[in-house]
Regions:
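Intrinsically disordered, low-complexity linker/loop segments enriched in Gly/Pro
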Residues: 127, 144-157, 195-196
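Short, Lys/Arg-enriched N-terminal segments with co-localized hydrophobic residues
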Residues: 1-4
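Well-ordered mid-protein domain cores that form the structural environment of catalytic cofactors
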Residues: 127-138
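A glycine-rich helix N-cap at a beta->alpha junction
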Residues: 67-68
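Active-site cofactor/substrate anionic-group-binding motifs, chiefly glycine-
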Residues: 71-72
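Conserved small/polar residues in nucleotide/adenosyl-binding loops
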Residues: 204-211
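Structural motif
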Residues: 6-51, 76-124, 153-193
Length: 215
């Protein structure tokens, strides 16, 4: 039985390809880098951002915690984290884009405390983030879950050897962000290796955090 295809691409070859094309930035790479940008009090300029909903929603969440966000154009933004006055990421931001929880690792790393709504509201089992929390605890943070909110705080964060039970892009980025400001060295084993992970590593290395990826 053949499935009826309502939409098709019909390609007729035999003609040499020529011309130019501009490749846009990767959304998943941009999300991690935008979260990391709040960790410094200097102004960070990020170029070649894709002009898509998820990016704009995360920028709104970053503004919501008090950071300064200046849109230069649809693909360039300046972020300054020195004006942050709120360490809570509310459920509305998480509901719109799950990657808002990257701000949890960034805020924990910068201020040793952060609060974020569970991605599934009060239902932690909907899309579990246990590997994120495991990593934060390994760095020395106390993690509690109350009334649909994840609360993290630490007197100080200390590097550790962390093994992820499952490969997780989100956990890898979140733990990496938190560990950037921790004392000592952190090793994340069984980490995700997607290209946007490498981009986030490259950014943190550029910001003078000594970060390496063994691929």
């Amino acid at each position: 039985m053949r499935c009826k295809m309502e939409n098709q691409y019909i390609i007729k070859g035999g003609t040499p390809l020529k011309g130019e094309v501009t490749i846009g930035g990767a959304k998943n790479a941009a999300l991690g880098i935008l979260a990391a940008a709040i960790m410094t009090d200097e102004t960070v300029t990020i170029e070649n951002l894709p002009d898509v909903r998820d990016i704009n929603v995360l920028l709104q969440a970053i503004e919501g915690i008090g950071a300064t966000v200046q849109r230069i154009n649809s693909h360039t933004v300046k972020i300054n984290g020195s004006t942050i006055g709120n360490i809570t990421i509310d459920y509305d931001s998480i509901r719109k884009i799950r990657a808002s929880y990257y701000l949890l690792g960034a805020l924990l790393g910068k201020y040793n405390k952060a609060q974020v709504a569970l991605p599934g509201g009060c239902d932690i089992g909907s899309r579990p983030i246990d590997q994120h929390l495991k990593g934060f605890r390994a760095l020395g943070a106390t993690v509690t879950i109350e009334h649909g909110m994840i609360n993290t705080f630490a007197d100080s964060l200390v590097g550790n050897h962390i093994f992820l039970d499952v490969v997780s892009v989100g956990a890898t980025i979140n733990i990496m962000l938190a560990s950037c400001m921790a004392e000592g060295r952190t090793v994340i084993e069984n980490a995700a290796k997607e290209p946007h992970i490498v981009d986030a590593v490259s950014y943190t290395h550029l910001r003078a955090h000594e970060t390496e990826a063994d691929l």
